[in-house]
Amino acid sequence: MVVNPRQVRDFAKATGRLAKTDRLDAEVIAHFAEAVRPEPRALPSADAQALGELVTRRQQLIEMRTAEGNRRRLATGRLRQQLDEHLAWLDRQLDDLDKELDDMLRNSPIWREQADVLRSAKGVGPILTATLLSALPELGQLNHKEIAALVGVAPFNRDSGMWQGKRQIWGGRGPVRAVLYMATLSAVRTNPAVRSFYQRLINAGKLHKVALVASMHKLLTILNAMTRDGRHWQPAEITP
């Protein structure tokens, strides 16, 4: 079983165990498992891990390309030429990686079917599809509140007595949330259900960021229901 190390460490602090050694860690983990009884979840398959590695590598290449592009703006002469060559190489690597990701999805009967379902929703492309399949195997197996909390797009209350703080999202699976964010930027333009939901929030006076996070939640809820039911995009029939 794999558990969130932050949860275990917070549990240790809550029980007054501030020291940290291998032996103490083992005791804390045992006490955590006994007290909290986290729900066991299956480890990703070898294929899912391989797909996840490709998704991670793609993100690394994107970050490298962004960094090199920023350096190029200030470079001159031979250095700029070297950066141009490296940027071209990174573009080729990204193209090859995208083809490899597409091949992995198309050559797997299970993934091919799931990918077809997910990509039937406007705004959902190959990168979000591969990310969800590799890093969110619980998609379609949890209810809409549970999947939103797992990804980290469910706002949490911060209230105390008469004081009411702003609701904020926190925790969750950062890599999934980052790709979902980019997909939602597309969905608010191209997906009728997400676009109308986003626009209603804007018209009600919500800030762009608040409306966008809520739209991320909306898109994830739709994809969770589609995966659960094994059905392609049918806005009128999909429910949480």
Predicted feature locations:
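Conserved NTP-handling cores and scaffolds of large molecular machines
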Residues: 33-40, 65, 140, 154-155, ...
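Basic, amphipathic alpha-helical segments enriched in Lys/Arg and hydrophobic/aromatic residues
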Residues: 204-240
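Charged, alpha-helix-enriched surfaces in structured cytosolic catalytic cores
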Residues: 24, 49, 56, 127, ...
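Hydrophobic (often cysteine-bearing) scaffold residues that line and stabilize catalytic clefts
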Residues: 93, 124, 176, 211-212
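Long, charge-rich intrinsically disordered scaffolds of nucleic-acid metabolism proteins
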Residues: 2-120, 131
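Phosphate-backbone recognition surface of nucleic-acid-processing proteins
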Residues: 126, 131-204, 208, 235, ...
